[in-house]
Amino acid sequence: MTVWTLQPVPADGDYLVFGVPYAGTGAASFKAWPRELGAGRFCAVQPPGRENRFGEAHVSSHQEFAEGLVAEIADRLDRPYALIGHCGAVPFLLQIAAHLEERGLPAPRRLFASGWGAPHKGLYGKLNFVDLDEVDMVAEIEERCAALGYRLPPEYLEMAAEILLADVRLQRGYRAEALPSRNVPVSVIGWTEDAVVPQSEVWPGWDECASATYHVLEGDHWEFLRFPRELRDLVEREMTAAIGA
């Protein structure tokens, strides 16, 4: 087991899918995702500064995140694997893949980039374009929880809000300076009812920086976390094709 994954990296399965949580969340955000994905296995990444790593300092850059994760999972990349993430997690996927290639390690067979536009075009989502001193982060957390059908106890709301604020500040500093090569294909995913990063903002420009395919799935911005059948089918189909190639 590594501190960078909530559970041990599975030793079985024909392929692995590593899930990187989006801003303000940790590995527990993947609680609706099964450990088995067809013939493959899913493994949720756990960044520092939250959940079971709450006492640790947050990373200061996307590169630091990539270096920390890769250092711990490098010896487990013994079969085809993918990275998947939603919204603000997407820049981390790109940084991780670029770092893996730079180190000469096995690269992901595919990235699944959900709810985020082309990285070189800038940032996406309202929290990247407002005065953070005037944003009620507690209300943001409550809105997310309500959309997913649960409530956080009051004592956890402030804690979650602080994590979200730290993550958004880091997100705002992202620049697409390290991107993986076109040898790492990207499945870009938009959602029909996404009001945070509308699908019309998701696709334009990806073909300029990646070998990308575009998929539109039914649901709102939070549907990714519910792991609908459409998304599961896409992941299993693409990874089955990857291991057969």
Language-model regions, residue ranges each:
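Domain-scale detector for complete catalytic domains at protein termini or as standalone homologs
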Residues: 1-84, 91, 95-245
